[in-house]
């Protein structure tokens, strides 16, 4: 794999709004920096407490949903004889599902023998009711089980921290000292009573089904937002004192804002700057910008013509037929490069995978972006190669800037804000929960 291919892969992944990789990267920076800061400012006990919470949460957060979904795929779906690889959005749309079934070709990507046509046909039995209900149950169950797993982690972490503090206190008492008059630590005076206050209220998952919308069901990033909201709620509910509650509010609120909101604002701002100041639109996927076929089409001036060929499509079905029947059209090729259209092998050729949903809003937006880039090239006095090289450079810079700015806030400013608040509130950056345990408050 050459440098261009590696660059394309990295930038494409980090700049993909549907990908979990950039979210995992930002969360990793956040978790690592907070853990290091906890060891430095709060001490060993808090460092361990934070490490279990942050990295344990990340493992559950990233692995929980996929694990439980796979478990349901291998159990409930297998029993129902339905292929989980068929996009449920297709089954939910009668017109789309008919087109998908009638135009299906090739073998399902998650099967060695089952055809795309058979997989779709199976899911359409009983009008797709069985498939839709099974899918909804799968997402709800996977989400609830993931949140329940985090709840168990939280209880285990808090017990581990308390046990560690008590162990340290016992060792301190056993150490010989020249000072007499040892007083019994408060925690041992009324140990049973403190236990009553350490058990957080068990979170309720009632009504979860009602709160899950289609956007959450069908989008892995939105699904993660529900997980984050649940984890944030549990962290706040299980806070061991008011200071920890406020710290969680600062940390979690900032994390969710930068993770899901600020990244999009940065991207829009950089894209607008590139278009206005440098006359280089960078809305297109890096995979499209680095494609030689696309570069040749730009050079020949055929991009706008190819996009306009789809303008005669009156209905979504017309557009679907256009995509299927025009594999050499640069607009269609760009849609495949942008992951808007999925493909599957059939008789040695890449054909449209009709089991995967094609979002027409994304397809139409791609057409506008292709025309915009082509028009900007025509207005410039640069060669196609020079124009594209500058555009690709700006695209790479925009993605890296987005990730970099978010990591700066999550990895430096937010941890600093948390401990600044703690010092302002308690007069020290030391672990207040440890002190509460020593004083018998927890």
Give the residues covered by each predicted segment.
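Glycine-rich, hydrophobic membrane-spanning regions of integral membrane proteins that mediate transport
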Residues: 1-442
């Amino acid at each position: 794999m050459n440098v261009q291919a590696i660059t394309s892969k990295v930038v494409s992944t980090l700049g993909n709004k549907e990908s979990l990789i950039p979210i995992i990267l930002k969360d990793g920076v956040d978790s690592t920096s907070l853990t290091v800061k906890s060891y430095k400012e709060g001490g060993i006990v808090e460092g361990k407490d934070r490490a279990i919470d942050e990295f344990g949460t990340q493992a559950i957060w990233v692995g929980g949903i996929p694990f439980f979904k796979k478990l349901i795929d291998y159990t409930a779906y297998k029993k129902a004889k339905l292929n989980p690889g068929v996009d449920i959005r297709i089954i939910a749309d009668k017109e789309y599902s008919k087109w998908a079934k009638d135009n299906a070709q090739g073998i399902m990507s998650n099967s060695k023998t089952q055809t795309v046509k058979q997989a779709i046909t199976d899911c359409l039995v009983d009008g797709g009711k069985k498939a839709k209900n099974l899918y909804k149950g799968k997402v709800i169950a996977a989400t609830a089980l993931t949140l329940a797993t985090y709840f168990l982690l939280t209880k285990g972490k808090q017990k581990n921290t308390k046990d560690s503090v008590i162990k340290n206190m016992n060792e301190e008492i056993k150490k010989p000292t020249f000072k007499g008059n040892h007083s019994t630590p408060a925690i041992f005076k009324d140990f049973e009573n403190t236990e009553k206050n350490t058990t957080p209220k068990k979170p309720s998952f009632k009504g979860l089904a009602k709160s899950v919308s289609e956007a959450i069901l069908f989008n892995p990033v939105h699904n993660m937002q529900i997980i984050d909201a649940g984890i944030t709620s549990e962290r706040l509910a299980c806070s061991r004192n008011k200071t920890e509650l406020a710290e969680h509010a600062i940390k979690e609120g900032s994390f969710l804002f930068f993770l899901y909101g600020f990244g999009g604002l940065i991207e829009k701002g950089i894209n607008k700057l590139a278009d206005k100041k440098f006359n280089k639109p960078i809305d297109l996927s890096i995979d499209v910008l680095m494609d030689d076929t696309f570069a040749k089409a730009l050079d020949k001036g055929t991009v706008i013509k190819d996009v306009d060929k789809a303008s005669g499509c009156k209905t979504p079905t017309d557009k679907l037929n256009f995509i299927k029947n025009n594999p050499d059209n640069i607009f269609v090729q760009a849609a495949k490069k942008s992951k808007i259209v999925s493909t599957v092998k059939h008789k040695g050729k890449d054909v449209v995978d009709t089991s995967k949903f094609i979002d027409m809003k994304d397809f139409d937006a791609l057409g506008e972006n292709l025309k915009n880039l082509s028009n900007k090239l025509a207005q410039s006095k640069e060669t196609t190669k020079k124009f594209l090289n500058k555009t690709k450079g700006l695209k790479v810079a925009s993605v890296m800037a987005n990730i970099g700015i978010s990591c700066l806030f999550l990895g430096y400013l937010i941890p600093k804000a948390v401990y600044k608040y703690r010092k302002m509130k308690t007069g020290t950056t030391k672990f207040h929960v440890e002190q509460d345990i020593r004083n018998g408050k927890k």
